[in-house]
Amino acid sequence: GKSTMLRAIGGIFSADEGTIDLHGHSISLLSIGVGFQKKLTGRENILLSGMVLGFEEDYIRERMNDIIEFSELGEFIDRPVKTYSSGMYSKLAFAITAILETEIILIDEVLSVGDAKFKKKSFKKMKSLISGENRTVLIVSHSIDTLQKLCTRVIWLHDGKLKMDGDPKEVLTAYDEFMSE
């Protein structure tokens, strides 16, 4: 349900009922298995992904080296994405999302992917994206620790319905107690 909701907000799925209005904001979905053309190289996918997100080609090319550097893919950037491990795939997806900085970022359980060094770097970048800008970041995660450290508001959905909405500490404590029953 939660991943489906993110994909509907991101425009990948259409909602069965109701409407989703993004008020013209650019949006990116960071989710394992979504968004890349497997036969294209990482570099080609950066360009394609950026254009799909609505960015001008010149802007994407200006940010290309920053994306490649952040992704830590080195020479693999010029190999087809189909040859990437899931960690490499996630690093590239995160780097594109983090460096191009859309107004709305949707994150589906991918902050825990990659080696310890990359996780730390990603967490730091995500923290700066959330706190330093006028941006909406929607995270689907079961990691209470991650949500406590990153979020200023938490919404708990259960069986497709809103269970609780508010302060991260309050909502996550209630969630943890509920899951322990």
Q: Predicted regions span which residues?
A:
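ABC ATPase "signature
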Residues: 165-166
